[in-house]
């Protein structure tokens, strides 16, 4: 698998984890966020290694957006 395909796989996984935050039980939300963040970081790394700087930039923006959503809507849920 080439790095760009790997980046796409990690991105899909990250988006699934992000979507799962909305359906998760309160005590599971942070785990979903942690998984989403991990998968986005791996996608960004794979994109960079493949020379996909535009893809890496897009993924970084998406990660920041998902983090902002977590901070505003989910932080403290289940604590």
Regions found by a protein language model. Give the residues of each.
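Amphipathic alpha-helical repeat scaffolds of TPR domains
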Residues: 2-23, 64-65
